[in-house]
């Protein structure tokens, strides 16, 4: 079974109204279901997607997550220091800025070894590296 991390962007694309690339990500989510992929995200990604979606899509999205469509990894408060370290490492103002959701996914990839990711942030995730130097395989 394949394991895939999911960023907020693809979830917003699928659940948002008239979003660009919605079909691409809808097809990927269908493929994930058909092939029994293990989909994982983090609470910051769920919060970001929820914030970007308007009602009633927001409610549909949260019910989808609540029904177990993907695993939501929690983190301990102490991990925020690690996230800040990642954010500082990858922020080059004013050009680029790593947000909390991205930092949480890089941390999750490092913790689990999963480097395949669904994201609309291709430019950013092409730059991010795990401590062992591995990059991300972007779907």
Which residues fall in each region the model found?
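Metal-dependent nucleic-acid phosphoesterase active-site entry motif
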Residues: 1-20
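PIN-domain endoribonuclease scaffold, especially VapC-family toxins
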Residues: 2-4, 23-97, 103, 107, ...
């Amino acid at each position: 079974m394949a394991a895939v991390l999911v960023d907020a962007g693809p979830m917003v694309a699928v659940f948002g109204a008239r979003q660009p690339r919605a079909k691409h990500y809808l097809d990927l989510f269908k493929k994930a279901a058909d092939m029994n992929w293990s989909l994982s995200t983090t609470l910051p990604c769920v919060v970001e997607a929820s914030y970007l979606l308007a009602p009633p899509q927001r409610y549909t999205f949260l019910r989808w997550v609540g029904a177990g469509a993907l695993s939501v990894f929690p983190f301990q408060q102490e991990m925020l220091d690690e996230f800040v370290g990642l954010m500082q490492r990858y922020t080059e103002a004013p050009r680029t800025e790593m947000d909390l959701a991205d930092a949480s996914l890089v941390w999750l990839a490092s913790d689990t070894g999963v480097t395949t990711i669904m994201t609309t942030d291709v430019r950013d995730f092409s730059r991010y590296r795990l401590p062992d130097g591995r990059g991300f395989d972007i779907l």
